[in-house]
Amino acid sequence: MSVHVQNSRMTTAKLRQMKMNGEKIAMLTSYDFTLASLVDEAGIDILLVGDSASNVVCGNQYTLPITVDEMIFLTKGVVRAAQHALVVCDMPFGSYQISEEDAVRNAIKILKESGCDAVKLEGGEEILPAIRHMIQAGVPVMGHLGLTPQSVNQFGGYGLRAKEEAEAEKLLHDAKLLDEAGCFSIVLEKIPAALAAKVTQAVSCPVIGIGAGNQCDGQVLVLHDMLGLNQGFKPKFLRHFASLASVVKDAVSEYITTVKESSFPNAEESY
């Protein structure tokens, strides 16, 4: 008989304790029940239903087109899969920039309808009022600084951020503001490793890096990228932990051959 352990679920409080203990935090994106189940069983700490689903799942060039309802739909499956991991849902572009009231309304909608544990927002001081209102309303918030893909048109690309002193100082300032506002964690994307280390030491909440060196409190990657499913995409910060694109293509090729040859299904596979 299996016994469900009530305290086995990851929580924001446990993440903070992990930082205090010097224990690294592992986070990956996930967009569906099947893969999320495997990743959760492997012991991941955080499952992020990223708006990168706009690229990975929907084939869009940018993250901008995906909607709140689409994010909720994807997150529901991941939540059903997660027996251990904390599930965080990205708030998509346009869902928190219009007004503080609109931001809180959308954040609550995401939590209520998807069942996720928290939301993630991109930006610093400019979205601080919205973040404060969300946290006051009881919504756990993860921040995101550095390269913020929803601002790709403003930045003009996906290059390294905070290289210059002024931008680095602003990023550190923003991180402190997010921490003071009550964000339970902050993602730092594609910034110099030395700056990421400085931010990690300066804030009390866990800092998760992607392309931000190894001195952050944890790391995050897009699942499909680290599994080698997205052919031709290999930025400097990405490590392939598997090469599944060739595995999938070989399996499909073999399936096609067996169908064409009428060797599948065979007698043992037929009723």
Regions found by a protein language model. Give the residues of each.
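Alpha/beta enzyme core
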Residues: 2-271
